[in-house]
Amino acid sequence: MANAYDAVVIGGGHNGLISGAFFAKAGARTVVLEARDKTGGAADTSAPWPEHPDFRVTTYSYVMSLMPPTIIRELQLERHGYKVTPFGPYYQAFPDGRSIKVYADDANKNFESISQFSKKDAETMPAWDAWLSGVADVMGPLLLHVPPKVGSMRPSDLIEQLRVVWSARGLGVRGVGDVTRLFTMSVSDLLDDWFESDEIKAMLTINGVIGTWAGPDSPGTAYVMLHHSIGDVGDGHLGSWGYQEGGMGGVSDACRRAAESLGAEIRTGARVARILVRGGRAVGVALESGEEIRAPVVVTTIHPQIAFLRLLDARELPGDFVRDIENWRTRSGVVKINLAISELPDFIADPGKELQDHHTGSVELCFSPQYAEEAFQDAHLFRKGAERPFVDGVIPTTLDKTLMPEGVHNFSMFTQWVPDDWAEEPHRDELEQYADRVIDLYDSLAPNFKASVIARQVLGPYDMEQELGLIGGNIFHGELSVDQLFHMRPAPGYADYRTPIRGLYHGSSATHAGGGVVGIPGWQAFRQAKRDRMVSRRAQ
């Protein structure tokens, strides 16, 4: 006999847990189903080395910024363990013995650091920050908007389109032009318009290519930079990032505790085999175990190509929607490298193994925009792992003492690129050789680095797809290209967190605002169900 609930949420990552928490808060009898033996998805903390059971790392995602305060506040996540500490400067050491540091909160230090390379760029930096902040002030709130059905003439849809236009009224003529450029330009071209020094451009390139199957010369990467520059961690500095205490699994744990405290049931080891549909409406799910769970509301927070192409019969969906999901681009060339190191890097540019501010922030490996472009072309054009990989690295244990025993640090490296078809097979030997190159490059900048490595974990696109269901290894559930954003994410007419099946809602990162540990998609899926009066009367 089937179990009955008011709402079933598929996927126990942060979006699923947040969606389940809001349903439970509304009084709905809610169950969240996670296929793995633990919740969290990519926001996970693990102990990957059996020989070092007390060494913990943030497995996949690694830093926090983009979750809106309204979600944190309404679910009281801080009460349940959400605690983010802003990290230090963006730091890049260069082979010539110089380095650059860019702070979120210290314009004077930025001027001093950038002046080594270009006084003109140092003078330009405040104007750049002001310009980007101005655009972000208008665009940031759009993350909380439900995308309208552009082109629809239904009165309700026209009203939603007007609301979006009205929300952007502060841009002005010049601002609209700026936004157009951000959505269409490459990050390289945009930075060339502002700066002359490759060193400062290298530092700013980072946010334009994180997680993308595109190099800095690719159109649209300027938007990716904006996406990563519109959050904060409650410190009042736009674009700041931070470390969650206990690693990113601490974020998921806080979401899980919040959901459970509100009455949601969380089940792990519960893999969904089918979404049950009767007469064009969702009525529940069937698990691989054979168990059926009935509910008038089903929310999927897993990858859309799994949810719509594997868990549903294509005959239950419109043909154009199926084609859009089949053609959804979800490529990646990301490799996550987790290291345990016995001492902090002793950089030639900034000597010393003792803790310094440059250890506490983002420790980059990108010497110029061209460096990043060559790394991408190695994977894209020459179909090999980058000879000189691009790295966004952090050492969270400099500020979070809960992850490792005293005297040991975790260096968490988000690296790019390897060929996108490495998602199809493990490529274990090639990945280890790629990781060797990353370590050697850091060792050339900090000669104690290679010898300090105690243990390492190397995770490629195949691991991300097999373990997390991230098709292609794409951390965003789909590329952040201009044709896969806002009202096009994941398909025209279905960007409002609804689907062609009544009662089935979509709250994965493949919807608007997705990309990063944001939580907005799961929250919006709940809100749409509530608007549709799909949350049971008992739950209201």
Kindly give the residue locations of the regions a language model identified:
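N-terminal glycine-rich phosphate/pyrophosphate-binding loop and immediately adjacent elements
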Residues: 3-151, 480, 524
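Active-site/ligand-binding neighborhood in enzyme catalytic cores
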Residues: 133-262, 269, 470-484
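Extreme N-terminal leader/targeting segments of oxidoreductases
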Residues: 1-7, 25-26, 485-487, 491-492, ...
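A glycine-rich dinucleotide-binding beta-alpha-beta segment and adjacent secondary-structure elements
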Residues: 197, 201-217, 383-394, 448-512
